[in-house]
Amino acid sequence: MPAPVSVRDDLCRLVALSPGDGRIAGLVRQVCARALSLPSLPCEVAVNEPESPAEAVVAEFAEQFSVDVSAITGEQRSLLWTHLGEDAFGAVVAMYIADFVPRVRAGLEALGVGKEYLGWVTGPISWDHNTDLSAAVFNGFLPAVARMRALDPVTSELVRLRGAAQHNCRVCKSLREVSALDAGGSETLYGEIERFDTSVLLDVRAKAALRYADALIWTPAHLAVDVAVEVRSRFSDDEAVELTFDIMRNASNKVAVSLGADAPRVQQGTERYRIGLDGQTVFG
């Protein structure tokens, strides 16, 4: 099956984003790559080290964003807003791109699938100085991934909830996707995610997906061969590709978590949502 054009093209657009003078994008791409021990995304402007107090703040924030976003402190947030002002949000979205696109590359290459999504690795890049980063991510790339339909909804939801817990995204942990519930998801099943390796309720396919999610989140540069082999043996090529992109889509919660903007929409219990035909989240 050929790559969904929207996902492939939207991923290439993310790689090509180089707003302003390109220094912040270049800096966070280098910082995140070093933190992950992965190859950096291409940069229009190579920035190996910060050259101003503002860039030093960005570099520290980006490193923590990659290593463990849940550990970002209030002081780090305050410094970011103080030094960047209204540009802070865009800088954090740039961190998300710098942090997770290399993980996707590592995952796809380890699985031996999806090379059609990685043309930007060796191909020419037409740098984009004008497109808004948040629009490209939240209105373009993420809905395109959500429209992929190879993977079953229960596996997608298990992986989403695992990522929510690993990043400690409060709103994500409070949400439940309706199509997954309709397909057999339940609170009993979801309660097994935390101890999935020893669960008797989760099948081998679910466990393979969850191990792979953990690997991309915590050890993307050292993705174990047995983890990749297990995914390849349990999922089709299209499913494995979608699983990889689902993990990146779910990890967009790192933007909200890093900025302390991940409060749940409900005071107690959970809230249901579904993915619309356009790939956007529909609550209620």
From Swiss-Prot:
Gene3D superfamilies: AhpD-like (1.20.1290.10). It comes from the Bacteria. To E.coli YnjA. This is Uncharacterized protein Mb2340c. It comes from Mycobacterium bovis (strain ATCC BAA-935 / AF2122/97).
